[in-house]
Amino acid sequence: MNTVRVTFLLVFVLAVSLGQADKDENRMEMQEKTEQGKSYLDFAENLLLQKLEELEAKLLEEDSKESRNSRQKRCIGEGVPCDENDPRCCSGLVCLKPTLHGIWYKSYYCYRK
């Protein structure tokens, strides 16, 4: 009976001491993995950022191209005052200073080309 207790106590002490060593070893492994994970996450983040920038560039390029089927929006018609620096005349019109009529308004108007 006494030997059983001693054996049990010895096994218990060995299990606890080896468990602590494993715990410290596991902690070190976890630190290494988190450091590797951070570098992997940084790499993945940079890759995702590059893909998003490429996608954004494609979308902006598509927006800048005019479709034949799309109509022109928010343009100024013929004979309507326009801003010299930011003309928004419809296609086929140009923002020019008036010739005879409208001189007294001191403004630019949309005229046909």
From Swiss-Prot:
Tissues of expression: Expressed by the venom gland.
Record's subcellular location = Secreted
Which residues does the annotated region (Disordered) include? 61-82
InterPro entries noted in UniProt:
Toxin_22 (IPR012627)
Parts of the chain that traverse the membrane = none
The organism's place on the tree of life at top rank: Eukaryota
**Coiled coil segments of this chain:** none
Q: Does the keyword Secreted apply?
A: yes
Description of its domains? The presence of a 'disulfide through disulfide knot' structurally defines this protein as a knottin.
Q: Which family does it belong to?
A: Belongs to the neurotoxin 14 (magi-1) family. 01 (HNTX-16) subfamily.
Name of the protein this chain belongs to: U11-theraphotoxin-Hhn1f
Q: Output the lineage of the source organism.
A: Eukaryota, Metazoa, Ecdysozoa, Arthropoda, Chelicerata
